[in-house]
Amino acid sequence: EVKLVESGGGLVQPGGSLRLSCATSGFTFSDFYMEWVRQPPGKRLEWIAASRNKANDYTTEYSASVKGRFIVSRDTSQSILYLQMNALRAEDTAIYYCARDYYGBSYWYFDVWGAGTTVTVSS
């Protein structure tokens, strides 16, 4: 069974930092692109970061809203995806999800999602 389990959310003051984790199991972690997506209260899902697979040297990509503040990384020995979040702002308040990126039927889609972890940025 493929599983993604996020953790590390919580309440943090503006300007603070948090590190989210996404523990994965049931698939070969190094073979897949992995993504971080968030949903602010009352808003749509927003893609924020990607970690490409081993074949693509685990290169990363970020949305403009988090670039320079957030860092996505992997622990390949433990099959964990991380999101280091720095200089947090009130607008970063959201439920954060990790997702597996899958290619099938000639297009890419997120086929497995975690349940999410909540981040609240407030003084």
UniProtKB/Swiss-Prot annotation:
One of its GO terms (biological process) is immunoglobulin mediated immune response. It comes from the Eukaryota. PROSITE patterns: IG_LIKE (PS50835). Keywords: Adaptive immunity, Immunity, Immunoglobulin. Pfam families: V-set. GO terms for cellular component: extracellular region; immunoglobulin complex. Residues 1-114 form the Ig-like domain. One of its GO terms (molecular function) is antigen binding. SUPFAM superfamilies: Immunoglobulin (SSF48726). This chain was isolated from a myeloma protein that binds phosphorylcholine. PANTHER family: IMMUNOGLOBULIN HEAVY CHAIN. This is Ig heavy chain V region H8.
